[in-house]
């Protein structure tokens, strides 16, 4: 991740403390800010105005996507909202000719994600959030993963920077919110101990994880190489995560059965997305 003063980044800004902090710290390097108003809660317009006021004051170009209140979400809201969000980042990046995006995930987000993954009994080689990832052609950077939420709030309060609070973050509807509530009851030392547990797991699996990433750098989509690998499940997890497809061990086992049968040519991964066999080659296709 470059840290020059060149205006090279797109940034996602919700109006909450994390993204406002990130915007304030990187404002000189921001080419365009993106805000999505899902119109799902009474304070949505307030957050939009917080973002637009900050960008106007600091002369930062801003693109706003306002989702119709009547928009029908046909599946998990958070999953669909994420797709809407990142598709908007992608199209805005193309418009402004920028392919690097800043996201305000911090140390608490890392820990919450790691706990969610661990609680699902997913035997992963990496828990938490990556400093760098990608969404299609867009490079994603998370420069706040070394900061706790409390540190972000202290900065904003000290500098009297306005931000909004998303009240849906406190609803027990979502598993992440339940984990967040439980973590809020811990001391800083206890939270750090939980974090250290996952960092140690990641360190222990570092060599194996690198070998899984290296596999894809030379893989020619021959599915025999995939199913014959001792890291089959981890390979599939990484491949799916890069293509925004949910992974489960049961799905991986069903795919293994599909690949071992000669007659079947396609496997449904999610609505409109299939795994297609063409000879010994394998690809993910939207139909």
UniProtKB/Swiss-Prot annotation:
Disulfide bonds: none annotated. Belongs to the tRNA(Ile)-lysidine synthase family. GO terms for biological process: tRNA modification. It is found in: Cytoplasm. Gene3D superfamilies: HUPs (3.40.50.620). GO terms for molecular function: ATP binding; tRNA(Ile)-lysidine synthase activity. GO terms for cellular component: cytoplasm. NCBIfam families: lysidine_TilS_N. InterPro entries: Rossmann-like_a/b/a_fold, TilS/TtcA_N, tRNA_Ile_lys_synt, tRNA_Ile_lys_synt_N. Ligates lysine onto the cytidine present at position 34 of the AUA codon-specific tRNA(Ile) that contains the anticodon CAU, in an ATP-dependent manner. Cytidine is converted to lysidine, thus changing the amino acid specificity of the tRNA from methionine to isoleucine. The N-terminal region contains the highly conserved SGGXDS motif, predicted to be a P-loop motif involved in ATP binding. This is tRNA(Ile)-lysidine synthase. ATP binds at residues 14-19. SUPFAM superfamilies: Adenine nucleotide alpha hydrolases-like. It catalyses: cytidine(34) in tRNA(Ile2) + L-lysine + ATP = lysidine(34) in tRNA(Ile2) + AMP + diphosphate + H(+). Its EC number is 6.3.4.19. The keyword tRNA processing applies. It comes from the Bacteria. Transmembrane segments: none annotated.
């Amino acid at each position: 991740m470059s840290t020059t003063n060149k205006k090279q980044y797109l940034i996602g800004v919700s109006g909450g403390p994390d993204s406002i902090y990130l915007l304030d710290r990187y404002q000189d390097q921001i080419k365009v800010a993106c805000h999505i108003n899902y119109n799902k809660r009474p304070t949505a317009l307030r957050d939009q105005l917080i973002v637009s006021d900050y960008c106007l004051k600091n002369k930062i170009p801003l693109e706003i996507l306002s989702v119709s209140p009547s928009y029908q979400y046909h599946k998990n809201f958070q999953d669909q909202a994420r797709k809407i969000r990142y598709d908007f980042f992608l199209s805005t990046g193309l418009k402004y000719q920028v392919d690097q995006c800043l996201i305000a995930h911090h140390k608490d987000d890392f820990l919450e994600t790691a706990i969610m993954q661990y609680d699902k009994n997913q035997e992963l080689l990496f828990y938490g959030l990556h400093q760098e990832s990608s969404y299609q052609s867009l490079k994603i950077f998370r420069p706040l993963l070394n900061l706790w939420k409390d540190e972000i709030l202290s900065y904003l309060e000290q500098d009297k920077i306005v931000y909004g609070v998303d009240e849906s973050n406190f609803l027990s509807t979502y598993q992440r919110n339940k984990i967040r509530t439980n973590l809020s009851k811990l001391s800083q030392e206890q939270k750090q101990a939980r974090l250290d547990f996952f960092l140690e797991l990641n360190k222990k699996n570092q060599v194996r994880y690198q070998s899984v990433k290296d596999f894809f750098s030379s893989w020619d989509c021959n599915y025999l190489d995939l199913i014959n690998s001792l890291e089959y499940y981890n390979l599939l997890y990484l491949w799916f995560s890069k293509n925004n497809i949910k992974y489960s061990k049961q799905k991986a086992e069903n795919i293994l059965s599909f690949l071992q049968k000669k007659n079947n040519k396609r496997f449904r991964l999610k609505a409109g997305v299939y795994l297609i066999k063409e000879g010994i080659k394998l690809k993910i296709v939207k139909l």
